[in-house]
Each structure stands twice: as C-alpha cells, then as structure tokens.
Amino acid sequence: MYNWNETNNELKKTFVFATFKEAIDWMVKASVEIEKQNHHPTWTNEYNKVHVCLTTHDEGNTITQKDRELAQALDTIEVNGAF
C-alpha cells in the first residue's frame, strides 16, 4: 500500500489526476474491483482528486484485511498510464 494514512480506524488516501475526466475514469475502473471484492469505500470526487476512505463497518468500523486488500488493488489501477 502506497501513501495510505491510517487514522480513526480508517485507511485514507487522495488520488490526484491531471484532469476531472481522468479522476472519473479511475473511479469507473475502481468500481469494477470494488464490486469484485464486494467491499465498498466511502469516496468523494473533487475535480481532479478522488478521496477514498476504507473501513469495515460490519467489524465495528475497524481496519481489516478486506480494507488492506482493496487499498492494494486500488493502488494498481491506472488511467492513461498514470496512477
């Protein structure tokens, strides 16, 4: 996991892209992996940024292996050759 912050029982990261379109394209690609893992983040889009927050609600809002696995997968998703 690259540049994820662990605070308040959550893993957090902001992904930064060159444009709004790249940010949205990344979210679309990420949604495929999110559905595959059936582990859904809280996330927001702010122009060229996507803020992602991971925690496992059914384990008492704590960080679990599910969160770490999704974080690692999200780190590998590229848009136009960039992360």
Regions found by a protein language model. Name each.
Residues 31-39, 78:
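A common structural junction motif
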Residues 28-29, 72:
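Solvent-exposed alpha-helix faces
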Residues 1-10:
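Short aromatic-glycine-(Arg/Gly/Cys) micro-motifs in beta-strand/loop hairpins
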Residues 10-18:
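Short, well-ordered beta-strand elements within core beta-sheets of diverse protein domains
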Residues 55-83:
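C-terminal structural segments of small proteins and small subunits
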Residues 19-28:
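Short amphipathic alpha-helices within nucleic acid-binding modules
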Residues 47-57:
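Disulfide-stabilized extracellular beta-strand modules
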Residues 4, 42-45:
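Short beta-strand
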